[in-house]
């Protein structure tokens, strides 16, 4: 049995490679959970074992090309997996759902007329409370890769109202009675005793 190959390099979407070269690459179908990792092992379509040591902070997307230490090229495909699709003709309702999912840093795929997330019973209740349908299906999952990087998840033990409750707590703490004066550390809008030049 041959030694496992080592894979360390990513060519995003195969940029700069000829179509003929990409066509010869081995295909590797991976679910999002694996595409979100930098260290993993998989058996390739030619039967060889491959160990992946990819740069941290990357999320593999459909069409990325990986290069092994022996020169082999591997084309990443998003595998079908269990997902929840939120579809609607009402763009405003979808935007509300996207807002709440984004507020919880939930990896979310944005499509024309739909959102897609990984199954989560608490989130599905929230989606239904917003008047949308949450449909379980098998489909590729390709969430947006945004400012939050790899898409960490918060615990959903907190309730649907947790964000609002936190905001109210911060507001209440800020509004506690306090003395304004030379030792006051924050800026106040409104009353001030210096003239403005016009």
UniProtKB/Swiss-Prot annotation:
UniProt-annotated stretches for the region Disordered: 176-198
Domain of life (superkingdom): Bacteria
CDD domains named among the record's database cross-references: UreE
Keywords: Chaperone, Cytoplasm, Nickel
Record InterPro entries: UreE, UreE_C_dom, UreE_N, UreE_N_sf
GO biological process, one term: protein-containing complex assembly
Location(s), subcellular: Cytoplasm
Entry annotated with the keyword Cytoplasm: yes
Gene Ontology cellular-component annotations: cytoplasm
GO terms, molecular function: nickel cation binding; unfolded protein binding
Pfam annotation, one family: UreE_C
Membership in a protein family: Belongs to the UreE family.
Function: Involved in urease metallocenter assembly. Binds nickel. Probably functions as a nickel donor during metallocenter assembly.
Name assigned to this protein: Urease accessory protein UreE
Gene of this entry: ureE
């Amino acid at each position: 049995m041959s030694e496992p190959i080592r894979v360390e390099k990513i060519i995003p979407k195969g940029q700069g490679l000829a179509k003929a070269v990409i066509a010869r690459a081995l295909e590797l179908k991976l679910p999002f959970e694996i595409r979100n990792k930098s260290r993993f092992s998989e058996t390739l379509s030619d039967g060889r074992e491959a160990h992946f040591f990819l740069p941290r902070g990357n999320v593999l997307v459909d069409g990325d090309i990986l290069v092994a230490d022996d020169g082999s090229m591997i084309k990443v495909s998003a595998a079908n997996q269990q997902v929840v699709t939120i579809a609607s003709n009402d763009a405003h309702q979808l935007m509300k759902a996207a807002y709440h999912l984004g507020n919880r840093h939930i990896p979310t795929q944005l499509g024309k007329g739909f959102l897609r997330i990984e199954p989560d019973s608490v989130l599905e209740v929230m989606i239904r409370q917003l008047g949308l349908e949450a449909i379980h299906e098998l489909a590729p999952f390709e969430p947006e890769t945004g400012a939050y990087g790899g898409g960490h998840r918060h615990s959903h033990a907190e309730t649907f109202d947790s964000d609002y409750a936190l905001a109210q707590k911060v507001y209440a703490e800020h509004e506690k009675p306090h003395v304004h004066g030379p030792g006051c550390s924050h800026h106040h809008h409104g009353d001030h005793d210096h003239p403005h030049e016009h």
